[in-house]
Design a protein with these regions (language model features):
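Conserved N-terminal entry element of GNAT/NAT acetyltransferase domains
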Residues: 1-45
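Conserved donor-binding loop and adjoining core beta-sheet/short helix segment
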Residues: 29-51, 79-81, 88-101, 105-110
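A short helix-loop-beta-strand connector motif used in the catalytic cores of GNAT acetyltransferases and
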Residues: 47-76, 98, 115
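Conserved acyl-donor/pantetheine-binding loop and adjacent beta-alpha core of acyl/acetyltransferases
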Residues: 65, 69, 83-119, 126, ...
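Conserved acetyl-CoA-binding loop-helix of GNAT-fold acetyltransferases
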Residues: 116-121, 127-144, 174
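Conserved GNAT acetyl-CoA-binding A-motif
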Residues: 135, 142-163
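C-terminal "cap" of GNAT-fold acetyltransferases
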Residues: 164-175, 180-197
Length: 197
C-alpha cells in the first residue's frame, strides 16, 4: 500500500473513536513508554503541570476533552478508504495557540501560524511516506484555515523512528520548510510560507 492508497481525514469529534483505537492498539506497539502521552504533551500547561506525574488516564481524558471542544486538531491516516479501515497514522496540527506547551517565549505572529506538533505512525507503516502524506495534508488544511505559515519542531538528529515524533528534518526541508531557529538542545523550528505575502 502506498500513500495514494491511504485516506487522510481531519480529526473531528466524530472521529474520536478512531483516534482512541489507533493510540490503544497500533500507535506505540514498539515504544510503549510513549503510550501514556495521548498526544497531550504539546497542549499541557507545563508551568502548572508536572508532566511525569500525570497518568495515562489523565492525558487520555484531557485529549478527549480537547478533541471534543476543537482545541486539539490534526489529521488521521487510514489504511484505505473502506468505512472500517483502521487509522495507521496521526499528525497533531492546528493553530499555534493550541500548543503553547511547546514554547517558552511568546511568538508575536502566533495567530498567523499553524503549528505541526507531532507525528505518530504505526510501526508496520513507517517508511512508506505516511508522515509525508500527513504533512502535505496538514499544510493544505492550515492554508485553507487562513494561516500564513506552517511551523514544525523537529530535532537536528534523531536516533530512531520512535524518537522522531516531531517529524524528521529531511521531511520538512523536502516540503519547502526552512530552519528559522536552533535551540542548544538540538531542537529546531522550521517554517514554510503558505500564502503569498
Amino acid at each position: 500500500m502506498t500513500p495514494s492508497d491511504i485516506a487522510i481525514e481531519p480529526l473531528t469529534p466524530q472521529r474520536l473513536p478512531d483516534f482512541l483505537d489507533f493510540f490503544e492498539h497500533r500507535a506505540f506497539t514498539d515504544n510503549p513508554r510513549w503510550q501514556s502521552c495521548w498526544c497531550h504533551f504539546p497542549h499541557a500547561d507545563h508551568a502548572t503541570v508536572v508532566w511525569k506525574e500525570r497518568s495515562s488516564a489523565e492525558n487520555r481524558a484531557a485529549s478527549c476533552t480537547r478533541i471534543e471542544n476543537g482545541t486539539m486538531t490534526g489529521w488521521l491516516a487510514y489504511a484505505g478508504t473502506a468505512p472500517d479501515a483502521p487509522a495507521i497514522g496521526w499528525c497533531n496540527a492546528g493553530p499555534r495557540r493550541f500548543i503553547e506547551g511547546l514554547f517558552d517565549e511568546p511568538e508575536p505572529l502566533a495567530d498567523r501560524i499553524g503549528a505541526i506538533a507531532c507525528f505518530v505512525i504505526a510501526p508496520a507503516w513507517r517508511g512508506k511516506r505516511i508522515a509525508t502524506a500527513l504533512l502535505d495534508a496538514a499544510c493544505a488544511g492550515l492554508r485553507a484555515q487562513g494561516f500564513a505559515w506552517a511551523e514544525g519542531y523537529p530535532r537536528a538528529d534523531t536516533a530512531n523512528a520512535g524518537e522522531a515524533h516531531h517529524g524528521p528534518l529531511a521531511m520538512y526541508t523536502a516540503a519547502g520548510f526552512e530552519v528559522i531557529k536552533t535551540e542548544p538542545d538540538g531542537g529546531l523550528t522550521v517554517r514554510k510560507r503558505l500564502v503569498a505575502p
